[in-house]
């Protein structure tokens, strides 16, 4: 009898263990792993961490009930009847070869459903090639090289305006200044990091300038992560262009600005691509030295207040507590891409990659964190609704100066010389 009782007790324990394991397995299955691949070390580490924090903020909106936020999926808890988004972080260090190997690891070992990344276009290119070969989804927020969406890829989708779009907008603004303000801008210099992003930005600058009749008098590449830009800035100073287009990320941007101060030179106007210019942390570091530079942006607190009120709610509730600053134009676009992917998964009703890709290719998605309010992808994955404005920074505040529809402040033109600041 004692043996039977003992056997029964052991059987009950085994049954409970099996049931608990089964329950744990079911619980584990209610998770969708999304990889985020950004530069978390190196010269662009601050920007990379901001991008991660924006994706985490979007995940919080999706995973939790947020009736106070009027954004897609915010009112429910999770997607597909309770699935939660789990973010898996990876660091590509700003190195293309590391981006490739980390993308392979995320897909093959971490078993992520999709990757969001990579900030640096030079890292996005090989990482997204890994995704394409594996027939896995790759969502890109802010990498701006136009070539990325000219590869005919099926599984790649990008939110940001390309360098081609921004170059054309920069030239349009110069033409406006020449016509309305008698600016007399006739010559252009281009300074850019010698990477996928920088080289393509420079190519698009040349194309746009040529169409507009602007003469390029200086073409100045530099190695990203440089510790000295004196030679490059002296080259610009010697050519003395009326305008400069800049493509410098993170710490490279602040080094460039400070070097111009050291040599005592400024152009009449400086317009910058999706670079360190957009990062509030970089501008805080520069202080008043950062004033009067301009650049393309898809987000600023002032723009959000007028055109993107729900983005401010998300920012205050989930982003600023992590980053101790507002969204910037780069980071917010990475968060957008998680929202878009989650909407596509919800519409598909399953984790069928091909079905989700078809939805991404054909449908339009409302986006509370996009200036245009919507996202729609063209063949190749470029967002047809991508929108950028030109801002000028003063006292660490971004004021919109162009297009006129969004204009909020009068530009300071020409740039105030260093000696008069």
Regions found by a protein language model. Name each.
Residues 2-17, 26-421:
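Extracytosolic ligand-binding ectodomains
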């Amino acid at each position: 009898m004692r043996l039977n009782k003992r056997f029964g007790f052991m059987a009950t324990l085994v049954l409970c263990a099996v049931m608990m394991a089964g329950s744990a397995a079911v619980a584990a299955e209610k998770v969708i792993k999304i990889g985020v691949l950004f530069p978390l070390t190196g010269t662009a580490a601050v920007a990379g961490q901001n991008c991660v924090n924006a994706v985490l903020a979007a995940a919080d909106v999706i995973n939790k009930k947020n009736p106070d936020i009027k954004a897609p999926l915010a009112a429910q808890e999770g997607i597909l009847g309770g699935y939660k988004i789990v973010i898996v972080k990876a660091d590509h260090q700003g190195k293309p070869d590391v981006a490739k190997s980390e993308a392979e690891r995320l897909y093959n070992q971490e078993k992520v459903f999709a990757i969001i990344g990579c900030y640096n276009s030079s890292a996005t290119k090989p990482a997204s090639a890994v995704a394409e070969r594996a027939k896995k989804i790759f969502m890109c927020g802010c990498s701006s090289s136009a070539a990325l969406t000219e590869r005919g890829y099926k599984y790649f989708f990008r939110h940001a305006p390309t360098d081609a779009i921004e170059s054309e907008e920069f030239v349009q603004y110069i033409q406006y200044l020449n016509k309305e303000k008698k600016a007399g801008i006739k010559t252009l210099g281009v300074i850019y990091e010698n990477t996928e992003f920088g080289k393509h930005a420079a190519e698009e600058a040349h194309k746009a300038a040529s169409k507009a009749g602007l003469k390029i008098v200086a073409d100045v590449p530099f190695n990203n992560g440089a510790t000295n830009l004196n030679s490059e800035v002296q080259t610009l100073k010697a050519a003395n262009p009326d305008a400069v287009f800049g493509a410098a990320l993170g710490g490279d941007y602040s080094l460039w600005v400070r070097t111009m101060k050291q040599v005592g030179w400024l152009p009449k106007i400086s317009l910058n691509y999706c670079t360190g210019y957009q990062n509030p942390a970089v501008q805080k570091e520069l202080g008043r030295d950062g004033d009067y530079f301009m650049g393309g942006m898809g987000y600023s607190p002032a723009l959000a207040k007028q055109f993107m009120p729900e983005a401010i709610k998300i920012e205050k509730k989930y982003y600023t507590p992590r980053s101790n600053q507002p969204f910037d134009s780069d980071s917010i676009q990475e968060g957008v891409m998680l929202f878009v992917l989650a909407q596509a998964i919800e519409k598909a009703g399953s984790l069928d990659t091909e079905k989700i890709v078809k939805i991404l290719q054909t449908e339009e998605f409302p986006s509370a964190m996009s200036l245009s309010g919507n996202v729609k992808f063209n063949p190749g994955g470029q967002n047809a609704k991508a929108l950028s404005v030109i801002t000028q920074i003063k006292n660490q505040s971004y004021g919109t100066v162009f297009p006129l529809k969004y204009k909020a402040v009068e530009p300071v033109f020409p740039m105030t010389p260093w000696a008069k600041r």
